[in-house]
């Protein structure tokens, strides 16, 4: 049982998969929903301070390196372009926009991407952590409901025809 909890915890730390993949895996392994949810939130949030503090510095450092330069340039350019577009649309509501970006469980919109975007946009650390925490909590609720079949049951209940 402990092995399954550790597996889910570490899966929730993996970029792209994050808690969006860890919650269904945990429930599929027969783990209880609430402990799985909290464990996945913790695992998903654990890398956030490190990403904020070091990812941008690493990308800038690697920008002109022959081996990793193309990847670093791609990440910086993509992050700045997307971040500036988000900033232009959100204006003063950038923290809320980042929360919603992280909270909608779609590929590429998790805490890793949100934290990197916040770092590239020079958002305050506190605002990035708050937005990511809110977004991870929201994504976890959505994934938990979807994984336990509640969303499917509600859509069947309220379907027309």
Which ranges hold each PLM region?
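Interfacial loop-to-transmembrane junctions
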Residues: 118-141
């Amino acid at each position: 049982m402990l092995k399954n909890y550790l597996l889910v915890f570490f899966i929730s730390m993996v970029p792209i998969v994050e808690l969006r993949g860890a919650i269904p895996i945990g429930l599929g392994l027969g783990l209880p929903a609430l402990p799985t949810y909290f464990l996945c939130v913790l695992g998903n949030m654990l890398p956030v301070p490190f990403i904020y503090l070091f990812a941008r510095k690493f990308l800038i450092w690697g920008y002109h390196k022959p081996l990793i330069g193309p990847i670093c340039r791609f990440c910086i350019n993509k992050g700045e372009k997307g971040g500036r577009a988000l900033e232009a649309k959100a204006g003063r509501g950038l923290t809320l926009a980042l929360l919603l970006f992280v909270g909608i469980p779609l590929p590429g919109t998790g805490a890793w991407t949100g934290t990197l975007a916040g770092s590239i946009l020079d958002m305050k650390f506190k605002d990035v952590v708050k937005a990511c925490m809110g977004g991870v909590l929201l994504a976890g609720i959505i994934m938990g409901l979807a994984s336990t079949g509640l969303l499917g049951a509600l859509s069947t209940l309220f379907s027309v025809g």
